[in-house]
């Protein structure tokens, strides 16, 4: 099949785009050797590389938030220690579950 016959039925806006096509000018395989990574350090073969599942942006924002709030946490802990009585625990034991166990 000739190139002209192959390209004949294709819809085009400008036919001169295909008139300059030459198969010889298409990328030729070069004789250059491909670049290869050569490690500078020797790593153990049993080393396992694990990728983080969280997004880089989310991880960065969490780190910034932790840095920002670390000072606030320290201030609260110091204030509680100086005040004498520690704050009550945030979680309170459920009393209804004990009552349910007594009924059965």
From Swiss-Prot:
Output compositional bias ranges, type Basic and acidic residues.
67-77
Q: Which GO terms describe its biological process?
A: positive regulation of proteasomal ubiquitin-dependent protein catabolic process; protein polyubiquitination
Q: Which UniProt keywords apply?
A: Ubl conjugation pathway
Pathway in which this enzyme or protein is active: Protein modification; protein ubiquitination
Any Gene Ontology CC annotation = Cul4-RING E3 ubiquitin ligase complex
> Where are the annotated segments for Disordered?
67-104
One Pfam family assigned to this protein is DDA1
The record's listing under InterPro entries reads: DDA1-like, DDA1_dom
- So what family is this one in? Belongs to the DDA1 family.
Q: How does it assemble?
A: Component of numerous DCX (DDB1-CUL4-X-box) E3 ubiquitin-protein ligase complexes which consist of a core of DDB1, cullin-4 (CUL4A or CUL4B), DDA1 and RBX1.
Q: What does this protein do?
A: Functions as a component of numerous distinct DCX (DDB1-CUL4-X-box) E3 ubiquitin-protein ligase complexes which mediate the ubiquitination and subsequent proteasomal degradation of target proteins. In the DCX complexes, acts as a scaffolding subunit required to stabilize the complex.
Which protein are we looking at?
DET1- and DDB1-associated protein 1
- From which source organism is this entry? Danio rerio (Zebrafish)
């Amino acid at each position: 099949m000739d190139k002209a016959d192959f390209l004949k039925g294709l819809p085009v806006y400008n036919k001169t785009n295909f008139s300059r096509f030459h198969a010889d000018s298409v990328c030729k395989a070069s004789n250059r050797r491909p670049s290869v990574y050569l490690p500078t350090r020797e790593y153990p073969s049993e080393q396992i590389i694990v990728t983080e599942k969280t997004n880089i942006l989310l991880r960065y924002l969490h780190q910034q938030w932790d840095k920002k709030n670390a000072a606030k946490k320290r201030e609260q802990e110091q204030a509680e220690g100086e005040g004498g009585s520690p704050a009550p625990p945030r979680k309170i034991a459920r009393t209804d579950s004990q009552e349910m166990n007594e009924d059965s």
